[in-house]
């Protein structure tokens, strides 16, 4: 993979040197202006790294424009900085100021307690046993309305802190919701005959089967509801899982700079739930057995990093969960609060949502994503 990236970089530089004269003559002025404007809107290092990685999307830059950009004085003046950024990307060194513990916690997943593990396991069509997790005993939870919150952080939390409306609001113009996937290669358990090519355990680069597909479904529901969405379809956890939150943070910062109208950021993942023996379980909504259960994971300042407004994100999560509870009381699992920030310090409308588990099927996750997106849209359009 590293050889492929390096080859792409050398090839693009060589082509730019050979074709500079032709590009300068034939490249449309508007195309060049738009490309340079994108340089202004997005940090140069991030933009070029996205290009070299090949994850900018089909409409990122045309070939002629890319070649022209490689030869601009702006790029030549910043060659040293770009080289340093490229080296850092390959080495995947974590930023000491960032929230690296999130990667490790997400990889660990959830282990069912003995009480949550059924005595008799019924295997479903994709080979995974099924459970529906719900809280019935308020002991150990912070309870706010119909929402149960498991505070696994060192930050103080009381139900009285969650009263009032959440802070984030829809704007009048421009993109309003950013959907991103810090761990985009996470995937599900497919039925026999529908398997995908794996890149790691329960992970794939096939965007029709991983979290990118789930984000596509959410984006479509939100768009149909009249909400403007930016969906980042990049994979930040491949080829290295470590450092994914650093890389997605750089993109979130870039999007918020480019689109200041964005008030809500959804980082869409899937969970991994297993018993003490390592058996993967699927989690299903009790009211719709064709839909997986979802869970909000809310970051805090419990780990010592600055995140004073984290409870605003939690208030939003509670509002969305109350909306969904009316029709699907068990669609959402209890909310989990952790010490890590998960990049949620960037807005007061940032949520990490786990759609299903590694044991769920893609179809169950898609159905859950669409139900969730409809409830999320209804909540933020009502504003309370």
Across the structure, where does each feature detected by a protein language model lie?
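A short, glycine/acidic-enriched catalytic loop
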Residues: 197-201, 273-308
């Amino acid at each position: 993979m590293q050889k492929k990236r390096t080859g792409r970089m050398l090839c693009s530089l060589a082509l730019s040197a050979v074709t500079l004269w032709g590009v300068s003559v034939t490249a449309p002025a508007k195309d060049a202006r738009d490309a340079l404007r994108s340089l202004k809107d997005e940090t140069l290092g991030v933009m070029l790294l996205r290009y070299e990685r090949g994850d900018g999307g089909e409409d990122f830059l045309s070939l002629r424009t890319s070649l022209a950009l490689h030869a601009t004085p702006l790029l030549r003046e910043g060659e040293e900085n770009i080289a340093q950024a490229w080296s850092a990307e390959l080495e995947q060194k974590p930023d000491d100021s960032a929230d690296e513990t999130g990667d490790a916690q997400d990889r660990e997943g959830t282990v069912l307690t003995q009480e949550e593990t059924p005595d008799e396991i019924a295997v479903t069509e994709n080979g995974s046993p099924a459970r529906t997790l719900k809280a019935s005993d308020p002991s150990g939870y912070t309870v706010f309305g119909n929402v149960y919150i498991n505070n696994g952080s060192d930050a103080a939390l009381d139900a009285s802190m969650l009263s009032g409306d959440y802070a984030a609001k829809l704007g009048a113009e421009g993109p309003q919701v950013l959907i991103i996937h810090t761990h985009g290669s996470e995937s599900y358990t497919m039925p026999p005959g529908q398997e995908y090519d794996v890149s790691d355990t329960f992970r794939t680069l096939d965007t029709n089967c991983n979290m990118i597909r789930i984000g596509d479904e959410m984006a479509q529901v939100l768009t149909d509801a009249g909400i403007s969405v930016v969906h980042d379809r990049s994979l930040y956890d491949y080829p290295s899982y470590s450092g994914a939150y650093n890389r997605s943070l750089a993109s979130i910062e870039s999007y918020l700079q480019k689109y200041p109208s964005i008030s809500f950021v959804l980082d869409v993942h899937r969970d991994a739930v297993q018993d003490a023996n390592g058996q993967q379980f699927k989690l299903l909504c009790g009211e719709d057995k064709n839909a997986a259960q979802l869970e909000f994971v809310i970051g805090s300042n419990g780990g010592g990093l600055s995140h004073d407004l984290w409870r605003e994100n939690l208030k939003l999560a509670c509002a969305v969960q109350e909306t969904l509870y009316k029709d699907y009381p068990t669609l959402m699992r209890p909310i989990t609060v952790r010490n890590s920030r998960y990049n949620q310090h960037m807005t007061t409308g940032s949520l990490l949502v786990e759609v299903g588990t590694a044991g769920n099927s893609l179809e169950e996750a898609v159905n859950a994503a669409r139900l969730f997106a409809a409830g999320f849209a209804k909540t933020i359009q009502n504003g309370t």
